[in-house]
A protein has these predicted regions:
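Alpha/beta-hydrolase fold catalytic core
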Residues: 1-20, 41-45, 82-84, 113
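Structural cue for short, hydrophobic secondary-structure segments
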Residues: 22-25, 48
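Conserved hydrolase catalytic core segment
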Residues: 83-113
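Active-site glycine-rich loops that stabilize anionic/oxyanionic intermediates
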Residues: 16-17, 25-28, 91
Length: 113
């Protein structure tokens, strides 16, 4: 099911279990994970989202940076009531995942880049 946060981040949440967030690559959107979702949602609560300026999400509120995208992710987790999560990042998503791990280590249960 598709949702939108107060800052214009569009995301989907599917499955049950520990939460895992999937971050897409530059110029892509959350649909890139469509082939992994059937397997992952059997065991995990999976959040996929569009980075600001990608897919259905709004444009970034200021000049894009890894810090800004890390802030986008923490905002998403707060609005979705997720306390800890595993994060999987592809391409720039991996860079954002590393920045998120640096900024919010207590919110991270696992990291895959």
């Amino acid at each position: 099911m598709k949702h939108s946060t107060s800052d214009g981040t569009v995301y989907q949440r599917n499955g049950f279990g520990p939460t895992v967030v999937l971050i897409h690559g530059l110029g892509m959107n959350r649909a890139m994970w469509q082939w992994q979702l059937p397997s992952l949602t059997k065991d995990f609560d999976v959040l996929t989202y569009d980075l600001w300026g990608h897919g259905e999400s709004s444009n970034p509120p200021s000049r894009p940076s890894l810090r800004l995208f890390s802030d986008q992710l923490i905002g998403l987790l707060n609005e979705a009531n997720v306390t800890t999560t595993g994060v999987v990042g592809f391409s720039i998503g991996g860079m954002i995942a590393r920045r998120f791990a640096y900024d919010h280590p207590s919110r991270l249960s696992a990291l895959a880049i």
